[in-house]
Structure formats: C-alpha cells, structure tokens
Amino acid sequence: MRITNTLTGKKEEFVPIQPGVVRMYVCGPTVYDLIHVGNARPAVVFDVFRRYLEYRGYRVIMVQNFTDIDDKIINKANQLGVDYKTVADTFIAEYWRDAHALGIRPANFHPRTTDFVDDIVEIIERLVEKGVAYQTETGVYFDVRKFEKYGELSKKKIEDLIAGARVEVDETKKFPLDFSLWKKAKPGEPCWKSPWGEGRPGWHIECTVMSVKILGESFDIHAGGEDLVFPHHENEKAQAEALTGKVFARYWMHNGMVRFLGDKMSKSTGNIFTVREAVKRYGRDGLRYMILSKHYRSPMDFSEELLQDYSRAVKRVWEILGRYEKSGDIGIPKRNAVYEEYVNRFVEALDDDFNTPVAVSLIFELARNLSKAMDDNDREDALLYYHLIRREFGPVLGLFDLNEEKKEVSSEELLKLLIEVRDVLRKEKRYDLSDRIRDHLREIGIILKDTPSGTEYTVE
Ligand SMILES: Nc1ncnc2c1ncn2[C@@H]1O[C@H](COP(=O)(O)OP(=O)(O)OP(=O)(O)O)[C@@H](O)[C@H]1O
Ligand SMILES: [Zn+2]
C-alpha cells in the first residue's frame, strides 16, 4: 500500500513499525462551535482510511484529541457568560451527535487536553532542562533555532517562514518563530499550576504529549488537514524530536481544504455550512459520497447544489438496492472470478494513495450492474453485485452499509408514521393521545411544530 507522505513529498510504500499494527493520531477539533463540512472532510477521510486498514488486516490504534482549552474557547465562554468547561463539554457532546449522524466510528482514544496537563508540564520541564525551551514573563517558549530540522515537514526555510506566515506576536520571545509551550494566565483566565506559575498549555504541545503518551515516542501515521502542516505539525514534530531524539511520526497524511464562497471554509471567517444542516437536508450518505468522490489531497469546492447532486445520486442507488431487497435473495454469493476482480479493483485503487474516487465509482458501477441483472432476471449476478455493495465495500466506505443504514432509514420512517398517526388523532379530537405522542417525542429530543402546511420536526 502506498501513501503520499508530506514529510518526504513522495508516494511511499507504507510499512508500519510493528507488523500488522498501525498506530495513528489525527488532530481533532477545537470545541467551541458545531463542526462544519470542512471539518467533516478529515473526519470522513481518516475514518474510511482506518476502516480500509482494518479491511486489509491491520489492527489500528487510532487517537483523536479534543482541544478543550484554547483562546477561542475562552472567548466563546466570555461571550456566553459561562466557564470554559461548559463550552467544551457542550461542543464535545455536539461533536458526538454530528459524528454519529455522519457515520464516523469513534477512535480508540479521545483524549482531552485538560486531562493531560500534568504530563504536559512534565514534558515542558524536560524541554527546558534540555535547553530547547526558555521562560519569559509571559510564558515558556520553544527555541526554534535549537532544533536543526525545523522546517523539514513544511519544507520551508526559516527566513521564508518568518516572512510568509502568521507568527505569534510576543515582545518577550528571542526569535519570531519561537512558539509558546506554556501561557501564563491573565487575571480571570482558567489556569493550572506549574513551575512557571499558573497558566495553560500552548496548542502544539498538547498533541505532542497526547500522541507520545498514548502511542509511544515513534508511531506510524499523523494526520489532519493541510492547514495544520505549518505551524501546528511542524511544531509538534520539533517538540517531540527535540525531546526524544527519535523520528516522531513516520508518515504524515494531509487532506486538502474544503472551499466555500471562494475561501477555506472556516469558523473564524464565518463561511460555514454545518454538518448538522448538511446531513439533515441531504442525508449522511450524500455528504460522505461528496467527500469520498474527491481525492483526499485535492482541494474541494463546496456548494449546496453540488451536495444536492450527490444526494440524488445516492438516492438512485438506494432505489436500486430497495428494489432488489423486495424480492431478491440476500444470502452469501459464491466468490467467483467476477467477485475477485471487483475486490482487486477496489484494493488496487485504495492501495494507490487511498484513491477513494475510484473506489466509490465501483459502487455506482455495481449498482448499474445490479439494476440490469434484475431487468434480465439474472438472480445469481444480482446477488453478487448486491453483496459487493452492501457487505464487501459498503462497510469500508461507510456508504450503503447494510447493518448501519437500515437503522437510520427506519427511525425516520417511524417518525413520519407517528406524525401521521398524530394528525389523524387530532382530526378526531383525541387530544389525550395526540398530546401524549408530542410530549413523549419532546422527552427524547424531537420537537414537533404544527404549521399551516403540516407538521415539521426538529431534533434537539
Ligand atoms: N475547510 C477545511 N477543509 C478541510 N479540512 C478542514 C477545514 N477546516 C478545518 N479543517 C480540519 O478540521 C480539523 C479540525 O479543525 P479545527 O477545529 O482545529 O479548526 P477549524 O475548523 O479550522 O477552525 P476555523 O474554522 O476557525 O479555522 C483539522 O484537521 C483541520 O485541518
Ligand atoms: Zn494536533
């Protein structure tokens, strides 16, 4: 299997440190708002990448953090008049709702920064002892000029980095690119004790510490959006390698940016489309299909019309699958030459730098074949195509997955049925029963709203 490694800029054969096991760290969200379609891209891409590694027989140990303390979280807390923890807890819960709706499997570990403050302090102390970090009045900083390989990941010279990038401004630093490991608290800010006074960890050190503590000093894959290459990943790498003297992550994988209205989709710019809205309007398979039909490293332009097109294409496949399920056999087909050929094409595509566009196009090809086989009343072939879509490839791509998708469809259908029954009850003035339905739904977070054009529902 070959993947493009940002560290070398080349497509390389993937060989894990421990045979058969892949240790992988993905930078997770800073939790101060709902996730948007841009954030959904790494979530879906690396979820499917992990499923594929498992499909190929690896055991995967995956870590995805939550950044639960940061300036943006503190600002949001101040805006809302609550403490930072309420903001973090709220948006972690919201993250889970969206991730679940999007069919993202939880990683094996979801560490939160604030649970690792003791480890972070200990590692910063070791960096200070090694002479690669120093203290000023405002905090503790990493001394970039002490780490020779700085710039290796982002492939930039130090001079260019200073000129081109946004660097943390602080009068007390020795060098513009030095970045904070520990920020001393201003009055009223959340803080933890440390040898340098009360304060909080910088953003980059948390990922270094959580990855090294959970996965070890060297691990296989470090992933995230390409906006993180500099400074975040360059800094994570510098801290870890200055600390241990070993290679930190051996392969770095970065997804391209989702653009919306001409810019990177971003909470800070405000040009966002939330995952919640996208899934509600166009279904989770529509969004997953849109994301997977672009190669993960290419930029991706988002528009609602495009998402709608993908959602329609997905519906057509569902219709074909539904037609088959009404009458067809859903047993296990024979693994014949055609079966093998499809598996080979699937593996060949995904082994080649995780080419999901080719893999999803196979699903659509199979759906067309299935439709034709039904027209021709060719039962054996139909079962084969059906099986390949729903049991062989579906679970890897998280699309048309037999076990998962059924539940989603049926809960929506059931809700529609309940609303219909309630309408009948109201027309017959049996308000005791109709109110009971409304109240009970409200208790489980489904709010009904009666409008002149019918009853609508929202999920809280
Ligand atoms: N537009 C985008 N396209 C693709 N990936 C993105 C996009 N925006 C963020 N990501 C990725 O989503 C993950 C979580 O991002 P994070 O919560 O740190 O902030 P963010 O959404 O980029 O914040 P902001 O929107 O304020 O820039 C990271 O891996 C990041 O690279
Ligand atoms: Zn990170």
From Swiss-Prot:
Keywords, in A-Z order: Aminoacyl-tRNA synthetase, ATP-binding, Cytoplasm, Ligase, Metal-binding, Nucleotide-binding, Protein biosynthesis, Zinc
Binding annotation for ATP: K267
InterPro entries for this protein: Cys-tRNA-ligase, Cys-tRNA-synt_Ia_DALR, Cys-tRNA/MSH_ligase, Rossmann-like_a/b/a_fold, tRNA-synt_1_cat_dom, tRNAsynth_Ia_anticodon-bd
Subcellular locations according to the entry: Cytoplasm
Main location: cytoplasm
Cofactor note: Binds 1 zinc ion per subunit.
Motif, 'HIGH' region: chain positions: 29-39
Cofactor(s) annotated in UniProt: Zn(2+)
GO cellular component: cytosol
Motif ('KMSKS' region): 264-268
Residues binding Zn(2+), per UniProt: C27, C207, H232, E236
Quaternary structure and interacting proteins, as annotated: Monomer.
HAMAP family named in the record: Cys_tRNA_synth
Protein name: Cysteine--tRNA ligase
The organism of origin for this protein: Thermotoga petrophila (strain ATCC BAA-488 / DSM 13995 / JCM 10881 / RKU-1)
Gene: cysS
